[in-house]
Every structure is written in C-alpha cells, then in structure tokens.
Amino acid sequence: PLQTLVEIENEILLSQKIIMDNLGIKPDLFAYPYGEASSAVQGIIKKYFKAAFGQHSGAFSFNDPYYIARFPINENYGSLERIKSSSTVLSFKHSSIMPNDPFMKIPQKRFVLDFQENPSSINCYFSDFQGSILGTKTTMNTKLLYELDRMPVPGRLRVNCTKIDQGTFWYGYQYYLN
C-alpha cells in the first residue's frame, strides 16, 4: 500500500498483459505481495479479479472474498503434521473486525471482532514484530472488544482467533502499520 493507487493499477494491468501475451490466460485470483493490502487497493483488485488472498493464517472463508486467509506451506511450515492440521481447520460462519482496513496509518490498541455467535469460547491473539501483545478482553453480546496493553509497532500486526467446538475454528487477519 505504499505505492500510489495509479502505480498499483498500472502494475496490475502490465502484469495481466504479460501473462496474457505469454500464457494466453487472464488470472482471476490475486495474492497481495506480503499480504499488504488496504481498502483502497481492494477496490482496484475487485475491478480485475474474482478473489484475493492475504498472507495471514486462517481457515478458508468467503466472508471477505478480497482478503482470504490461507495457511502457508513452505520449508518452514511444510511438515506433514502441519498440512494435516491446517486442512482440518474450520471457518467461522460470520466474522468481521474493526477497524476493517488492513492498512493502518495510525496504530491503535482497540479492536472489535464480531462472530455473530456467543463469543465466550473464542480467544484472540495479537502479535507484531516484537512478539505477542497481551490485552483485556470484554464480551458484548456477539462481539469481543480487545484493548491491547501496548501500542503495536510499525510493520505487520496479526490477529488470530480460535474456538474448539467439534473441531478447531480459526479466524485470521493481518494489518500493515505504516
């Protein structure tokens, strides 16, 4: 999100032209570089793609088709046990987070998550480049309010929420703090 919107759109158009010229296809899926997205960039992506993937872990869900979570499988996270474990994770039927823009110009310590169900058995974890961030959890009807103990540092801020109930449910979200 550090490029201008015009630069991002031009890069997408150029990339699509190169792919079309060399492979004869037009991609309809997008992966945000390093998972770094913003609401403004998502608006551009919606013009050219059917769905987009972030770089945050979580169960596959179409709750937000332009910021889909995924589990990376690579040399660091590619053991057979991890693949088996990741493939059985379930998504929450409904999930939303506030603030809802993955690009955060001003860091903040307060987050509201809504799963549209009783959240008493849901736990959320926050982490940035300095490690885990502890906080206070307050339950309000179907919502969880988290007040973090410290301000997140610039870079990536990850949110992971889980619930164990006839399977493991997982919600993930990634912010990029400028």
Residue ranges and their predicted role:
Residues 2-177:
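C-terminal active-site subregion of NodB/CE4 polysaccharide deacetylases
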